Amino acid sequence: VSRKWSINTAIDVLRETIREADEMGLSDVTICPEVLGKINQLGTLEEILEMCRIDERLIPTVDFGHLHARGMGCLNSPEDFEKVIEDIESSIGVERTRKLHVHFSRVEFTTGGEKKHWTIDDIQYGPEFEHLAGILIKKSMEPVIICESRDNMAEDAAKLRDIYINSGGKLYEESSHY
């Protein structure tokens, strides 16, 4: 099975899902396809953006740990994160990008991509949330951020929140999303 066939099939399924949601009166639902961490899986950032371009109600879930793993450790500076955000903005627009759905954790990877999620304190793995937090603030973004740390999600979510606030960010009411 080719990647092209897989992406076309995924797009067809998304279109059908949106049509069925509309028929059920759920036209206000947002669907967030996710960047996946293993090289052999459908779900590169470019593939997810291609899916999201078919309807305004599709917002990418950018798992920065997965992106870092797929790129063999590619997110090492604020500029690396800013480039990702700018690529998303040029693909789906600034306003949809401002409301991005984000997953974040440190990730161990191999040549096949993601191997294992780790905690924020496992500093031998990347990426660094501080780099992303600064870009989110600089671009006045209001993303939903989900912490996916291994065995420590609630505690690490609080650490991510504190990093964001200490970087100058402010928290937004949940009702302002989507």
Where are these regions (language model features)?
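Active-site-proximal loop/turn and secondary-structure-junction residues that shape catalytic pockets
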Residues: V1, V35-I39, F64-H68, R106-E108, ...
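Active-site acidic/histidine proton-transfer and metal-coordination neighborhood
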Residues: V1-V62
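Short, electropositive alpha-helical surface patch
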Residues: K4-E16, E46-E56, G113-A133, E155-Y172
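A structural signal for the main folded, soluble domain(s) of proteins
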Residues: I11, E16, E20-T30, L75-E79, ...
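Short helix-capping segments at alpha-helix termini
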Residues: A21-D28, R53-R57, I92-R96, K138-K139, ...
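Conserved, mostly hydrophobic/aromatic
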Residues: I31, D63, V102, I145
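Gly/Pro-rich active-site loop or hairpin
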Residues: A69-M141
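A short, acidic, flexible beta-alpha connecting loop/helix-capping segment that sits on the rim
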Residues: I145-E155
